[in-house]
Design a protein with these regions (language model features):
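A short beta-strand motif characteristic of beta-propeller blades
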Residues: 1, 30-36, 71-79, 120-127, ...
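Repeated scaffold domains used in trafficking and secretory/extracellular systems
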Residues: 2-9, 37-48, 81-90, 129-141, ...
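Recurrent small/Gly-Pro-centered beta-turn motifs in extracellular repeat architectures
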Residues: 18, 57, 99-102, 148-152, ...
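Short loop/turn segments that connect beta-strands within the blades of beta-propeller domains
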Residues: 10, 18-20, 28, 49, ...
Length: 226
């Protein structure tokens, strides 16, 4: 099997992203389909409990695919600004998809929330906050708590303080912000990028640092608050 930028599998399928093409395989490694609906498709994620994947393009597009029927469910263009490599994930129950986006400029971020029946955006959050920059997010599968990694700019627009916060999905606000060191932030930013790839060797080669310590946002958040 070819070397992919990202690779994922569940109980039924395997998915590999080359950038140009999304390859679908069965569990035995037999190729079932190749999708080329969105360019620069480097990362993907399985919806919990279903054979549906979200594919994210660094060009600012999303694609949602049903692997049982091997078809594109929906294609969304958020922006044509490049370098869209921030974090994304499904909620633990699969009812929502969360995507960190940069629709206006590479210096501004927002959090897009999509319901997963029709993959329609239901909320755009933090778009007016010019000081807070979002980078990665993760859910605790047991508690449903969402942790968000980011940083705050100072009055000059320069990165000032790095943080992990609880994102309250009901009130759609950041709560209980814990500030972390620049070293912790830099490691987590790169580690989470590698994690989004499914920990592939090809992506690791471009991380240019040792990622020997397995860390979650939850672990660092709890340690910062102790």
């Amino acid at each position: 099997m070819r070397r992919f930028w990202s690779f994922y599998q569940n109980e039924s399928y395997q998915v590999g992203c080359s950038g140009k093409t999304v390859y679908i395989y069965d569990k035995a490694g037999n190729e079932l389909a190749k999708f080329r609906d969105i360019p620069y498709a480097y990362t993907a994620a399985f919806m919990p409990g279903k054979n549906i994947i979200a594919v994210k393009s660094t060009e600012g597009r999303l694609g949602f695919y049903d692997l049982d029927s091997l078809c594109l469910l929906k294609r969304i263009t958020i922006t044509r600004i490049g370098a869209q490599d921030e974090g994304f994930c499904f909620s633990p129950d699969g009812s929502f998809f969360y995507n960190i986006e940069k629709p206006i400029t590479s210096l501004r971020t927002q959090l897009g929330v999509y319901e997963t029946n029709t993959f329609t955006k239901v909320s755009t959050l933090f778009a007016e906050d010019v000081r807070t920059v979002l980078r990665h997010l993760e859910f605790d599968e047991k508690t449903g708590t969402c942790y968000l990694l980011g940083y705050v700019r100072n009055d000059m627009g320069v990165r000032d303080r790095d943080f992990i916060a609880i994102f309250n999905t009901e009130s759609q606000t950041l709560q209980d912000i814990h500030f972390i060191s620049q070293k912790q932030y830099d490691y987590l930013e790169i580690y989470k990028h590698w994690e989004l790839s499914g920990f592939t060797e090809k992506t690791l080669e471009w991380c240019f640092c040792d990622l020997d310590e397995k860390l979650s946002l939850k672990e660092v958040y709890e340690a910062a608050g102790s």
